[in-house]
Each structure stands twice: as C-alpha cells, then as structure tokens.
C-alpha cells in the first residue's frame, strides 16, 4: 500500500511543478499593447530618425523589446531602444513599422505594428538631376557630377550641399563647374586620423537656387568610389636580362591597400606587356631599400639593348576598400635602354632600292651585249643582191612608165653646117 501512495504523491508534485512552470512562462508570451507617439524626422541631409514611447498598459513582469523593420520587411531589428535611425537617400518614400514584445525571440508574436512614413521633397520627378555620382580623389577631395533633368531650363543654377560626421553643420559646395553635358562640384575631404572615419558616409543633395526642381540625394560610402593619384616612377635598372622597376605610391595610401598594373613597351617588337601586381615589395638587393611608401617589381625577359618604356597605374583593393574598379591615371613614362638610329634606318631604306635598281639595269645591258657576243647575227645573201641591183631596177621601173611605141607627133628639121667650110671661109 505504501508504494501506490508514494506514486500518487510523486505524481501530484509533478503536476504542481508543471502547472507552476506553465503559469510562470505564460505571462511573457502575452501580446503587448502597441507603441505610442511614433514620429519621424530628418537630420542633416539623409539621416532619418524614428522615435516612439513605450506601450501603455504593458505587463509589469515584461522586459520590453521593440521589433522594427522597413516597409519591405528588410533590415529587421530587435532592440530595447525607443528610436531607430538610418542613412538613406530621400528620393523615395520610406516607412518603418514598430511593435513591442517581451523577448528577443523573433518567433514571438509582437504587438500590433505601428507604421510611420516619410516622403521625398515635393517637385516634378522629371526636373530632378540624374546620374548623380561622386568620387573621392586620392582621399583628399571629392568630385561630384550629374546630368540635368528633362524638364529643366538650360540656365538653371545648381547648388550642392554635403555633410559627414566630421562636420558640425551642412556645407555648401562653391566650386561648381561644367564639363560637356555634365555639371559638377568639388570640395575638400581629407582623411582624418579617426580609425572609424572611413566607415562613415558623405550625404549629398543637389537642387537649384530658385527651388524649381526636385532635390536629388545621394549617399557616398567612404570605403567605395576611391580613385588614387598616379604613382611616380623613381628608378629603372637592368640585371641579368631582368628589368627592375621602383616607384613611389600616391600619398595617403599604403602599399597593401593598392593593386598595380605595370606596362612595358619595347621599341623593337612594338608590343606592350602588362603585368598585374598584388604585392610589390622591395626585397631584391638591386632595389633601393628603406624608402618610405615605395614599391618594386621585377619584369623578366627584357631586352637591354633596345628602348623599353614603362608606365604604371594603381587602384584600391578589397582588402581595405569595398570598391576596386576605379583605376588611377597612368604615371609619367620612364624609358631605359637605347633606341636604334632611325635616320640611318630610313637612309638605308632609300638607298638600297636605288642600288638594286641600278644593278638590275646594268645587268640587263650586260646580258644584251653578252647575247650579241655569244649569238652573232647570220649574214643575209639576199641583201647583197638587193644592194647591187637596187638602182638598175629602179631605172627600169622608171622607163616602164613610157610607151616605146609612142610616135612623134611633130618632126623638127635642123640645118647641118660643115665645120671645115666654116674654117675656110674665115681664113
């Protein structure tokens, strides 16, 4: 009898423990009331901030957490703070939904979600500028450019405003310029020693002075759209048919954050070889060592007795930056070696054909004379007879024109005087 009694008592204890545990855990899973006083505001140019108050009538044994996400249910977040901010270009409408719950478990059903939206500035969308983009040049200044909107006047005066966390207030860009169809503006933006500076962004807004066009916004992360200055070639040297190239990196950059392209043009082959370099360390004894911010590369198999021209360009790599597509301009070219005398080469090109043509003419004349000597002309007997009887034949042909039987139509009589009688008479 003792065993059934003990089993019943143990069973009762388990039921009590299970019931107590279930009651204690049911309270946090209760749906809480919605948040109150949800509002939205804009700071600087593109910093949107939502704030709210805790729900009224929330459970006393509930540690409130707030579940929020944007209208497309992206970038979900559960946090105890009663605010949320985001940097976003205000070119489109953006909404935030907020609800309350008692834990960080996403599977827990939050309260009714409260939504608050912010719309972009009013204006004709066709009047807003297009292709607004900015490039951070050599970590020293930023250059932005854009195209005018479709429904804008050609004489529109644009203004660019910018802000980042190192500035106390919004600044206006003064260096407005025009390049072809593009408008643009540049402003100083120097890298600071703050390690988190490059993790920030620059907020950009472009509008007109008269307020007739719709403002356009852009956010430029400082880890992207970075374009270094071209490097500077310091030294070229040959060693064992290898070309050693040493250059100075652009300021504000370290070598491990750059990717290099070395181009070598040879005057003899008239071709260029391109080498992509990730690590350019000056470890060979031919390189000048202990030089700050310099890089080196060895080009194999280069002909030292010809003229070789070298140029280099660089870009950022993904080890330090998010973007690796913007190449710098090419460096100034540097040459090493000797180029063959082009004047002598051209002179030879002109003289050789003349000499060859003269030799061909002389050879032809010589061959003709040699032919006469080897094959003399054969005498023609008929020619001899033609020369002997040629005149007689001509006279015969001449007399053939007259008829030998032609009769004299008139007879003439001449007197004959004896010469002897004339002599006697004279004596």
From Swiss-Prot:
CDD domains: FN3. Keywords: Disulfide bond, Glycoprotein, Membrane, Receptor, Repeat, Signal, Transmembrane, Transmembrane helix. Gene3D superfamilies: Immunoglobulins (2.60.40.10). Residues 22-343 are extracellular. One of its GO terms (biological process) is positive regulation of immunoglobulin production. Glycans are attached at residues 37, 61, 105, 138, 157, 235, 265, 293, 329, 341. The chain crosses the membrane at residues 344-367. The keyword Metal-binding does not apply. It is found in: Membrane. It is a single-pass type I membrane protein. It comes from Homo sapiens (Human). The keyword Transmembrane helix applies. GO terms for cellular component: external side of plasma membrane; interleukin-13 receptor complex; plasma membrane; receptor complex. Disulfide bonds join 62-102, 95-117, 134-144, 173-185, 257-320, 282-296. This is Interleukin-13 receptor subunit alpha-1. SUPFAM superfamilies: Fibronectin type III. Pfam families: Il13Ra_Ig, IL6Ra-bind. Belongs to the type I cytokine receptor family. Type 5 subfamily. A motif (Box 1 motif) lies at residues 374-382.
